[in-house]
Swiss-Prot record:
Residues 1-22 are annotated as: Disordered. This is CASP-like protein 1E1. It comes from Ricinus communis. Glycans are attached at residue 52. Homodimer and heterodimers. Its main location: membrane.
Length: 192
């Protein structure tokens, strides 16, 4: 009888320890994803936020005069789409840092709030990525319909940094999508 009770207690200990490992593994994966989202969005904001380039460009006033060489500066805050991009990534990075701290609290009542805020970050990042990408494509190709010339042939470094920051932010937004999917899956499994 004692051996039977001992075996059932050992089995319960095994189940409990396995459950703790699974919870810890899930918590660790959430923590890693949140830290990754923080690193990606903060790097995207910094790379884009320090982006500027000055080039000397010839301007032809009339065909009879020689060209006038003028220094022209490209900065991220000259375009509202780029301002939106930097601010959105700064917000997402701040939220990722706060959510890492909130995940240590471990309150189950916070899970729906964090899920909602994760969804908000996904929407914010994807919209800012779209805005920055649209302006980036204009810079690379121009728009012949409205006579906008391409500028990336002049400001190559600036355009390359824009492209790099958009890629980083896009990966960061995919990490937030993974967080939303994992959290929703976890909530669904707990409701069964």
């Amino acid at each position: 009888m004692d051996s039977q009770n001992k075996n059932s207690v050992d089995a319960m200990d095994g189940i409990e320890s396995r459950g703790m490992k699974e919870r810890g593994g899930r918590t660790n994966s959430f923590l890693v994803l949140r830290v990754l989202a923080f690193v990606l969005t903060s790097t995207a904001a910094i790379v884009h936020g320090v982006n500027n380039q000055t080039e000397t460009v010839p301007i032809q006033l009339t065909s009879s005069m020689p060209p006038l060489y003028v220094p022209v500066v490209a900065k991220w805050h000259y375009l509202s789409a780029f301002v939106f991009f930097v601010v959105s990534n700064a917000i997402a990075c701040s939220y990722a840092a706060i959510s890492v701290m909130l995940s240590f609290c471990g309150k189950k009542s916070m899970v729906p709030i964090i899920l909602t805020l994760d969804l908000l970050m996904v929407a914010l990042l994807f919209s800012s990525n779209g805005a920055a990408t649209a302006i980036g494509v204009m810079g690379y190709k121009g728009n012949s319909h409205v006579k906008w010339n391409k500028v990336c042939n002049v400001f190559g470094k600036f355009c390359n940094q824009v492209a790099a920051s958009v890629v980083l932010s896009l990966i960061g937004s995919i990490v937030f999508v993974l967080l939303v999917m994992l959290t929703a899956f976890r909530l669904h499994n707990k409701s069964k």
